[in-house]
Amino acid sequence: EIEGEKIYTAILRDVSERKIIENDLRDSLAEKEILLQEVHHRVKNNLQVISSLFTLQGNSTDDPERLALIRESQHRIQSMALIHEKIYQSENLAQINFQHYVRDLVTEIFQSYQTSAVNVRLSFELEAVLLEINRAIPCALILNELTSNALKYAFAEQKNGNLKFVLKVENEQQLVLTVSDDGKGIPDKIKFSSAKTLGLRLVRVLTRQLNGKVELKQNPECLKSRGTMFIFHIPLK
């Protein structure tokens, strides 16, 4: 107060330029999100075209071995296409909830291999796990190989079987994926660390790419058969 009078001070600042910049940044970010979404959509469509070409190739041969190879390649492509489809459908364009992906991919593979001779029961124990696309695709390919191998070989000598998938996070730092079956088990002469089959070689290479670890052992839950259990420990970042 000065001689009994109150004095007020006001500062005016022109922020119109800052607002213009903020709006431009917001518009630019929205445009980039749309472009990224479109990229995932186009990648998915291109992969589906490749898958369709494999289907046409398969229709041109009656050789069972060639058909099997074509179908294996087709499944690998479809597993990658499904990743891009899930991201395209999601609000988060940088990550995918692998929990939903596991169930969808396994079900898709199961339906393609299903025969009347074998009654395989699928079971899932899946936690929500967010993965960036550069980790989701290798994990998807690993899942594809193990599911396909189990459906092709594990139950060849039995009419019923169980295939179980467990997905969880440990210490908020690593993904743990377990794929197990109660089938005949992997023969003793086949060592995972040196197996020459393309599927198991892919699993080894992809696990190393992710800086992960894999353990292969007899399924301890089996009572009448050896079974197989793969356990993967993969860093989330």
Language-model features, listed with the residues they occupy:
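Short loop/turn elements at sensory-signaling interfaces that couple input to output
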Residues: 1-8
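Histidine phosphotransfer helical core of two-component systems
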Residues: 27, 32-34, 42, 47-96
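Glycine-rich/acidic phosphate-handling loop/turn and adjacent ATP-lid/helix
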Residues: 174-200
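Glycine-rich ATP-binding loops of the HATPase_c
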Residues: 211-222
